[in-house]
């Protein structure tokens, strides 16, 4: 047991450095090509001329597509999905290291050029890749899946500063592939990755700064639960839209470079209306949580961002949809809160409360992982007072969504790339 905990610690350290490496590479490319050192792609888009804002995501998609197509022709193999750590956990615990690194590089290109796709998917993949590489050299074959799971959880902890949610992500989303006794090393890896990541970044701040002064009462629990019902209905709709967009892009029968370029061009067009569509949505989420906008502003940004996410994911841009889903959930919750706020004197607090609830419940509705989703929002914001209400709402959202749409967002993604 001590040996496993020691290896889990090493895996956590490797994962933290893998995540930090991707993050610093992303910042470097943003500085080189966008003249942006703020770390915010929305700020970068705001400072660009309209024609550069239009073309940059398309050029990034074109470059990523050329890279993927070149690799495919070189190896005569069809590329794997960028989240192939899930496939590795469900099969024999082995990676195609070269293909995974190429996918990560392609993800780096589309992320830094403004596509509305998550950077964290590549971060988690690289963390799992580092763990797998270490495991194959120093551990027996029957343990390889465990260390990939530890690496993925550690990568998620380092990317989102949420070690418990990262651990439960593995336990819930991949339920049945791990023994409960194996959760110990997973948690150790996740916590170590968070601590090392904090040392690298010289910060232990929460991912999102929220000033929620409300004391949750009976009325608030009712609103939280009703938001869970709403998210349970919206989750399957989002998954259906993503699947339809993917089929639409595939039906065009374009070569990968042109398909990704088209997705990027759509993002560029939308960014002419609002630069908030650029990137994974992190900075927009933070700005909404700091000062919730008016109803019509939320609605406008939400529609543009939703179309950008659908275009990016539908075109096959390598990356995750975890963080974009958080923004969509936040916007749905805030739209609901703004509508209800017309009838309550504390409309601002209700909007913020239901925005956080929307983040958790839509995540639960799309991942079918209610416990992970609840802990994720609590760990990212520090608002643990919401935990009981969020847990109930997330379970409701997950049950409704699972009833209406059998597959989670991860199973749907795997099916699209199989």
Swiss-Prot record:
Keyword Ribosomal protein attached: no
A cellular-component GO term for this protein: plasma membrane
Pfam families (alphabetical): Voltage_CLC
GO-annotated molecular function: voltage-gated chloride channel activity
The keyword Oxidoreductase appears for this protein: no
Superkingdom field: Bacteria
Annotated InterPro entries: Cl-channel_core, Cl-channel_volt-gated_ClcB, ClC, ClC-type_chloride_channel
TM segment ranges: 5-25, 54-74, 146-166, 168-188, 222-242, 258-278, 291-311, 316-336, 352-372, 380-400
Stretch forming the signal peptide: none
Ranges in coiled-coil conformation: none
Topology versus the membrane: Multi-pass membrane protein
Localization of this protein: Cell inner membrane
A GO BP annotation: response to acidic pH
Primary site of residence: membrane
Key words, A-Z: Cell inner membrane, Cell membrane, Chloride, Chloride channel, Ion channel, Ion transport, Membrane, Transmembrane, Transmembrane helix, Transport, Voltage-gated channel
Function, in words: Probably acts as an electrical shunt for an outwardly-directed proton pump that is linked to amino acid decarboxylation, as part of the extreme acid resistance (XAR) response.
Identification of the protein by name: Voltage-gated ClC-type chloride channel ClcB
Organism of derivation: Escherichia coli O139:H28 (strain E24377A / ETEC)
Gene from which this protein is expressed: clcB
